[in-house]
Every structure is written in C-alpha cells, then in structure tokens.
From Swiss-Prot:
One Pfam entry name: DUF1414
Cystine connections: none
Matches recorded under SUPFAM superfamilies: YejL-like (SSF158651)
Record protein name field: UPF0352 protein HD_1515
Family that this chain belongs to: Belongs to the UPF0352 family.
Length: 73
C-alpha cells in the first residue's frame, strides 16, 4: 500500500508472505481473511497507540491508503 517506507523491501515482503501463507494454510475465504486482518489492525492500534485521537488519525490514514491502493489496480 505505501509508496515509501522506512522498512526494507525484503522485510516487508517476508512479513506479507508469512501473513498470506497463514491465511492460505487455514483456507480462509475472503470475508474471514478481511475480518481477521481488520481485527489484527484494530488490536495493533489499540495496544500501541495511546490516545483515541491518534488511533483515529492512523485508522483514517490507513483507510485512505487502502482505498487508494485499490484504485491503482
């Protein structure tokens, strides 16, 4: 989704591959995959970002980036 990242491409690609592999291993249909990934994102924000305002800004930024990445395809 991101056009620029502070993370190395290899690190990002490996993490993405691992997440996809887990979903495939469980034969998760699209709706279940999206639910699980959404829950993961929610938990990451709730556990790591202290204020609700900051969480909402990050959630909005993430949502916009996701929508933009779908337009590009």
């Amino acid at each position: 989704m991101a056009k620029q990242s502070k993370y190395q491409s290899k690190q990002f690609e490996q993490l993405s591959y691992d997440l996809i592999t887990i979903l495939e291993k469980h034969k998760a249909p699209v709706d279940l995959s999206i639910m699980a990934l959404g829950n993961l994102v929610s938990n990451i924000l709730l556990e790591n970002i202290q204020t609700e305002t900051q969480r909402m800004v990050l959630a909005d930024t993430f949502s916009t980036a996701l929508k933009n990445s779908l337009k590009a395809r």
